[in-house]
């Protein structure tokens, strides 16, 4: 997952996961658009905010996001997703504050928006969690001591929730779905499509178009091309 276009474009694992999800869902819906709620641990602070290194736990941040792969070849999907993800201010960390604590007009506008039917959560690297100081909490997928994560009568927030994590070097993907809308066979097929898309993207060697730089500069693609030509 760190080779091919993902590495060449400087993409993060989340970009690869998102691009593959867009391709897998698009292959079934025929739509090149992915409207998804992204969830993060919130421990990557926006610019200007303190580092959370001396704190414990997650500061869960959720926000909706659109990704458009219209006219984008598959080999460039990761770079396209990355470029669009980087355009989200502060990694979406401000959304929750505006949605629930912002001025009335901001809360009303965000509350009126359509919530994504799909969510993606990249939990990151969980290797060695059984040896961590908090191992007695038994927070590990598949652990029999883990217990229920949500009340049985709590409404499903998304029609499809995709939970992804890396455990001891192995990528684990969990599909949590609304059984009233999907049957197991449909989800099994989607999971296979998703895995196939991930493998294709991870193995792809064709260099995609360069994404925007990780800098606060206001340079577009034409400006960058002009600078490169002047050297």
Each language-model region and where it sits:
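The DNA-recognition helices of helix-turn-helix-type DNA-binding domains
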Residues: 23-24, 90, 205
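Extended, hydrophobic beta-loop-alpha segments that form or line the acyl/peptidyl-thioester binding
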Residues: 32-39, 74, 96, 151-216
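His-Asp-centered acyl/peptidyl-transfer active-site segments
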Residues: 4-18, 28-147, 179-180
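A non-catalytic, amphipathic alpha-helix used as a structural packing/dimerization or gating element
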Residues: 20, 80, 189-193
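Short, charged, surface-exposed hinge/linker loops at domain edges
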Residues: 207-231
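Generic marker of residues within folded, mature protein domains
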Residues: 26, 53, 110, 152-154, ...
